[in-house]
Swiss-Prot record:
Gene assigned in the entry: mdh
EC number: 1.1.1.37
Alphabetized PROSITE patterns for the sequence: MDH
HAMAP family linked: Malate_dehydrog_1 (MF_01516)
Official protein name in the record: Malate dehydrogenase
Entry annotation: catalytic residues: H177
Length: 312
């Protein structure tokens, strides 16, 4: 099993690479790519960690050597948020980066499962889909927007509020991956209940958690370490499913049947070919239903922006 991390010299990429070097199954290969010349050195640094995961780093304009034979590609390349920016302010730079990298994936490892971490995810996933489609290699079961950070934040905040162990809580999060499009289904957590006010406040905190980190870092970056953890969790789940493990479920932002929007984050059963089944979002509370209805316009506009970037 070969996993490639694109954007591996950045804050998320290095954290993700460290976790994968430690946690990928024995015999796996990990390849790191970034435009930055430090990348081969990041791989050498990680290569000293005593796990049976082979690692190699590549830098420069051409990601091809890192992508050859990859089963899973995780893309974290791009610029990070600074105070006062929202995820959509990143669009102008990151759209071009994602387009370029996905074009290289389409040529070199078109059958790989691709996880997009680069923000704004609502839009960059649509860009990736259109690039793959133009190249004639798009498989909607193999392209994912990684929204796992919203899930792990939800798990943490719910556990804190309700005095639970974070490992005991698993919150499904649907919709998209920015602002109002992030919708934690707090009503579906077994054995935990919330007042209407608690649900509204907690939902808002989860939606704005990225900004909480950006502001706390005072201009020094955005959420890199927790995002590295989230991306590793998703990547490792994908690897386990690709290797035949049954019953692996994660939420991610994928193209579905278009019931809510062309791309939508929902619980997915993962399997040997990527998405095996898009699971139902279940019964929503009145607050959740209202939030879902209210966000769809925003989500659809985000998606349209990505489609237009490639097609216009």
């Amino acid at each position: 099993m070969k996993v490639a991390v694109l954007g591996a010299a950045g804050g998320i990429g290095q954290a993700l690479a460290l976790l994968l070097k430690n946690q990928l199954p024995s015999g796996s290969e990990l390849s790191l790519y970034d435009i930055a010349p430090v990348t081969p050195g990041v791989a050498v640094d990680l290569s000293h960690i005593p796990t049976a995961v082979k690692i190699k780093g590549f830098s420069g304009e051409d990601a091809t050597p890192a992508l050859e034979g990859a089963d899973v590609v995780l893309i974290s390349a791009g610029v990070a948020r600074k105070p006062g920016m929202d995820r959509s302010d990143l669009f102008n730079v990151n759209a071009g980066i994602v387009k370029n990298l996905v074009q290289q994936i389409a040529k070199t490892c078109p059958k790989a499962c691709v996880g997009i971490i680069t923000n704004p995810v609502n839009t960059t996933v649509a860009i990736a889909a259109e690039v793959l489609k133009k190249a004639g290699v798009y498989d909607k079961n193999k392209l994912f927007g990684v929204t796992t950070l919203d899930i792990i934040r939800s798990n943490t905040f719910v556990a804190e509020l309700k005095g639970k162990l974070p490992t005991e809580v698993e919150v499904p999060v649907i919709g998209g991956h920015s602002g109002v499009t992030i919708l934690p289904l707090l009503s579906q957590i077994p054995g935990v209940s919330f007042t209407e006010q608690e649900a509204a406040e907690l939902t808002k905190r989860i939606q704005n958690a990225g900004t909480e980190v950006v502001e706390a870092k005072a201009g020094g970056g955005s959420a890199t370490l927790s995002m590295g953890q989230a991306a590793a969790r998703f990547g490792l789940s994908l690897v386990r499913a690709l290797q035949g493990e049954k019953g692996v479920v994660e939420c991610a932002y994928v193209e579905g049947d278009g019931q809510y929007a062309r791309f939508f984050s929902q619980p997915l059963l993962l399997g040997k070919n990527g998405v095996e089944e898009r699971k139902s979002i279940g019964t929503l509370s009145a607050f959740e239903q209202h939030s879902l209805d209210a966000m769809l316009d925003t989500l659809k506009k985000d998606i349209q922006l990505g489609e237009d970037f490639i097609n216009k």
